[in-house]
Amino acid sequence: MKKHRFTFRPAKVLPVLAALLLLGSAAAAESGFEPFFRFDSGLTAWQEPLKNVRFLTQGAYTLTPLDPGKAEQFGLDPDAVPDTKGMDTLNISGSAEFSDGHFRELAQRLRELADGKEIWIVDCRIEGHALLNGISVSWYGDRNWAYKGMTLAEAEADERERFGALPGTSVTVYEVSDNVRGTSREIQVGTVMFEKELAESEGFHYLRLPCQDHSWPDEVAVDQFIAFMHTVDPDQVWLHFHCHAGKSRTAIFMAITDMMKNPDVSFEDIMLRHAMTGSNYLPYADPESDIADVYAKRAKRIRQVYDYLHEPGAADTVPWSDWIAGMDAQ
């Protein structure tokens, strides 16, 4: 297949809370799963190192061979080594969600690696989240889908109301394991900080892409990201992506960036090198999962977006959402 080099164009309180808790979301009401506040990484994770951090730039990453059992499950050679062309100049990173303390340490490292480049925090979570007293907390529904069906504007409005009502109140926050509510703690909320404010407090820019956990993003989010990439000089920006765990939604947009910046690298090599630096292997869809259809769509779409970006002229003239609608109609 002929490779098409992507063209970048430089750029230029209580009553409210009570009502929100009763309201929940339409998706939650339908499933019978009552949403709640959850610690993003456990009761004490804010005291531990930030999880799933990787920096893809020269001298900052390591390719870790896949576990042989996982490689067999994915249909891969456990000894395979991907092409690393372009990795040294990707200038991207990824991680799980961060507490205030995590973010301050991360910001220092990003500045060192960015070396004067403009830094963007790319938030790949649609679900509501904020820092309560510096600790990352989110609004959790079944499968982490409390905001299922919402637009980004609707999600952000709910997030602002829900979390904005918390200062001066006591709120119960839970741990979650395997979609089950676990240990809880009461928090007397003194401060609430939203992620955009956190990013800007370090002088960084902020971009939010609506993507539901475990899932392929809304097609409009892919449009949004590709349009964003048209407005920046890829050699003069550093992009830090994150979601909740930092393994899948983060991986999607890190991989799309790689595809756009390195059009001569094969799909298979891009997928493998991201899996070997900390991402989930996106082409694999677990057929035994009870959301196998969600994983199957994600696996299909990541390949299709590669094809879209490599179809001569497509990405410069046709939005991804229109292109994929045409493919689905065939």
Task: Annotate each language-model stretch with its function.
Residues 243, 249-250:
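Ser/Thr-glycine-rich phosphate-binding loops at phosphate-binding pockets of nucleotides
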Residues 26-239, 252-330:
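Cys-dependent protein tyrosine phosphatase-like superfamily
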Residues 207, 244-245:
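Intrinsically disordered, low-complexity Ser/Thr/Pro-rich tracts
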Residues 3-14:
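Bacterial N-terminal signal peptides that target proteins for export
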Residues 14-24:
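Bacterial N-terminal signal peptides
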